[in-house]
């Protein structure tokens, strides 16, 4: 027979204890709060474990009797003590059954002022099951805190106190697994997991409730069986975390000038409003005030697009997709109207020091005699001279690239204008082919005699036209050619005529001088174009040949530096030599074959 265990310490005596009804009443009245529940439950456990028979010897009944500090004054004999003990057990059984029924009815309704019975940990007589990591189970001890505070009492008949109860699949293992499952479900908490509902049958505060610490939880016990035979499962143990909860929208944005109270009044999310600084009205204004706002205030903040560049006059196409239209001073483009553009007139109004003149000499004025002799060599009539002068003047005026400044403070960039301080040929002209073709800078600055050469080609508009100083001019034998190029001129159309003239004099063994202002850009492009045509070279090969030279036939001209516009013109010239239908410039600039500006 198993001995029932009590939650309070008991004292075993060898003599027969004295007992009286007065002492029983005093015990129940003084210790009803602490040990009434424990004694009744232990007594009931004793009778359930021993069966329906209540007959026991005096030696068995003596250790299980409850010993108190009060001493009975009435002495009994051994025979009467046994009879009295049986009556005590009968009375105790009836009291315990009544106490259990009464506590089952009142277990779910705790009075507000009632304080649950708390037992010290040292009074536990049952060992805690292993593997729970100090987890306080409500089933391991009948009088635990969780069973008294948060759950209904469990029927003692369903609890197995066998030493091997951990091996049997009973209700204890089922409840333990269910609680472990509930712990695993609620361990991982995130921002979208709704908290578990609070227990309604507990009066203790839950402010210090920690989800991640299972040792500090008080998990309610599932009531597996009752008198009615119905099963109840706590919904909080099997609750799945809500991971599909839609996050709330961000709070509505507060307006820049609106009242602070209007922020929380609206729950609908709104997009940021239009900036009030541009419209000059506050967010609290009414709709009528906004509609009555003048359009002149909004027009002040309107972005004005920039003006079109000079090379895209009267053009509907994008300025970035059309190259500048450059004109040669040797001829006149008949398709262009001879008129001053509105941009040029606006330049004259804004700048007082800007004039539109032909840069044929150093004083930026037109030399009528030289321009007439260049275009009409065989005509000496004054009317023809005036017509030719007007034609050249109108051609230059129609190209806005030829705007020049008379101010002495203005200095053009080096890539657009050669500096006169460059002295690329301190030892005189450079031999660029078989001592017949020479490259040099302005001969007026170098003080050399141009009459020693059979052909002189001047391709710089900054240099003076020295045709009057060149003596004994004979066609195809002794000539002076003046072509006023700028750094942005379209030289590809003139290179065929110039290279043919050079090849003609070179074949006859005559000396040729090619020069510009510094001899490193425009005149160097003429020599490169001659190499391309004479030796059938590309632009890169011809350029490297002139720059590095040849030890026997060509001197190295390492100071040459044509700008990118002239390089593109050389590529255009190479395309024309190869009879290409689409030029390189058209491919690079993505422009159509003909452009009407």
From Swiss-Prot:
Q: Which GO terms describe its molecular function?
A: MAP kinase tyrosine phosphatase activity; MAP kinase tyrosine/serine/threonine phosphatase activity; protein tyrosine phosphatase activity; protein tyrosine/threonine phosphatase activity
**Active site per the UniProt annotation:** 516 (phosphocysteine intermediate)
Signal peptide positions (record): none
Any Pfam family the entry gives: DSPc
Output the InterPro entries linked to this UniProt entry: Dual-sp_phosphatase_cat-dom (IPR000340), Prot-tyrosine_phosphatase-like (IPR029021), Tyr_Pase_AS (IPR016130), Tyr_Pase_dom (IPR000387), TYR_PHOSPHATASE_DUAL_dom (IPR020422)
Q: Which reaction does it catalyse?
A: O-phospho-L-tyrosyl-[protein] + H2O = L-tyrosyl-[protein] + phosphate
- The EC number on file is 3.1.3.48
Q: Where is the composition biased (Low complexity)?
A: 55-81, 136-151
Q: Which domain of life is it from?
A: Eukaryota
Enumerate the residue ranges of region (Disordered).
Answer: 55-88, 107-228
Inactivation phenotype = Derepresses filamentous growth and decreases virulence and resistance to cell wall and osmotic stress.
Tyrosine-protein phosphatase domain boundaries: 428-579
Gene Ontology CC annotation, any one: cytoplasm
Keyword Phosphoprotein tagged = no
Alphabetized UniProt keyword annotations: Hydrolase, Protein phosphatase
Polar residues composition bias: residue spans: 107-126, 169-207, 216-228
Q: Name one GO biological process term.
A: hyphal growth
Q: Which family does it belong to?
A: Belongs to the protein-tyrosine phosphatase family. Non-receptor class dual specificity subfamily.
The entry's function note states: Protein tyrosine phosphatase that acts as a repressor of the yeast-hyphal switch. Plays an important role in virulence. Negatively regulates CST20-HST7-CEK1-CPH1 filamentous growth pathway. Represses hyphal genes such as SAP4, SA5, SAP6, and HYR1, by acting through a CEK1-independent mechanism.
The protein in question is named Dual specificity protein tyrosine phosphatase CCP1
Species annotation: Candida albicans (strain SC5314 / ATCC MYA-2876) (Yeast)
């Amino acid at each position: 027979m198993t001995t029932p265990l009590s939650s309070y310490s008991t004292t075993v005596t060898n003599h027969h204890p004295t007992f009286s009804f007065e002492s029983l009443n005093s015990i129940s009245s003084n210790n009803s709060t602490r040990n009434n529940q424990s004694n009744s439950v232990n007594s009931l456990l004793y009778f359930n474990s021993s069966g329906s028979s209540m007959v026991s010897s005096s030696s068995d009944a003596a250790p299980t009797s409850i010993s108190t500090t009060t001493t009975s004054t009435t002495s009994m004999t051994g025979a009467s003590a046994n009879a009295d003990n049986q009556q005590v057990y009968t009375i105790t059984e009836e009291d315990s059954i009544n106490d259990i029924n009464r506590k089952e009815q009142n277990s779910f309704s705790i009075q507000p002022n009632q304080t649950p019975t708390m037992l010290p940990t040292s009074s536990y007589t049952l060992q805690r099951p292993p593997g729970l990591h100090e987890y306080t189970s409500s089933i391991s001890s009948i009088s635990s805190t969780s069973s008294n505070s948060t759950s209904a009492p469990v029927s003692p008949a369903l609890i197995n106190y066998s030493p091997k109860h951990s091996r049997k699949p009973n209700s204890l293992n089922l409840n333990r697994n269910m609680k472990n499952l509930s712990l695993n479900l609620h361990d991982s908490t995130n921002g979208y997991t709704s908290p578990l509902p609070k227990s309604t049958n507990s009066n203790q505060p839950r402010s210090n409730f920690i989800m991640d610490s299972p040792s500090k939880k008080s998990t309610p016990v599932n009531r597996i069986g009752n008198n009615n035979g119905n099963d109840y499962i706590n919904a909080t143990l099997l609750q799945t975390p809500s991971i599909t909860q839609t996050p709330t929208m961000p709070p509505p944005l507060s307006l820049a000038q609106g009242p602070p109270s209007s922020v929380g009044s609206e729950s609908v999310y709104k997009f940021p409003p239009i900036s009030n600084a541009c419209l000059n009205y506050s967010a609290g204004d009414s709709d009528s005030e906004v509609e009555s706002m003048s359009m002149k205030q909004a027009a002040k903040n309107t972005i004005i697009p920039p003006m079109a560049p000079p090379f895209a006059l009267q053009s509907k196409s994008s300025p970035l997709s059309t190259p500048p239209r450059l004109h040669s001073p040797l001829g006149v483009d008949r398709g262009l109207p001879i008129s001053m553009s509105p941009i040029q007139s606006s330049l004259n109004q804004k700048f007082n020091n800007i004039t539109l003149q032909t840069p044929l000499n150093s004083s930026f004025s037109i030399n009528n005699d030289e321009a007439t002799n260049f275009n009409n060599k065989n005509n000496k009539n004054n009317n023809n001279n005036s017509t030719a002068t007007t034609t050249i003047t109108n051609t230059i005026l129609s190209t806005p690239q030829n705007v020049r400044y008379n101010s002495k403070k203005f200095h053009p960039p080096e890539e657009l204008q050669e500096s006169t301080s460059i002295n690329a040929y301190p030892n005189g002209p450079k031999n660029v082919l078989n001592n017949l073709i020479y490259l040099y800078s302005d001969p007026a600055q170098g003080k050399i005699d141009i009459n020693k050469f059979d052909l002189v080609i001047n391709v710089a508009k900054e240099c003076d036209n020295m045709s009057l100083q060149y003596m004994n001019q004979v066609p195809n034998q002794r000539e002076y050619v003046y072509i006023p190029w700028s750094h942005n001129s379209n030289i590809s159309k003139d290179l065929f005529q110039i290279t043919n003239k050079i090849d003609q004099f070179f074949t006859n063994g005559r000396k040729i001088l090619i020069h510009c202002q510094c001899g490193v850009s425009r005149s160097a492009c003429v020599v490169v174009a001659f190499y391309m045509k004479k030796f059938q070279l590309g632009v890169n090969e011809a350029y490297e040949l002139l720059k590095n030279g040849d030890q026997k036939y060509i001197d190295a001209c390492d100071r040459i530096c044509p700008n990118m516009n002239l390089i593109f013109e050389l590529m255009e010239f190479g395309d024309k030599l190869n009879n290409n239908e689409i030029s390189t410039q058209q491919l690079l600039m993505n422009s159509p074959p003909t452009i009407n500006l």
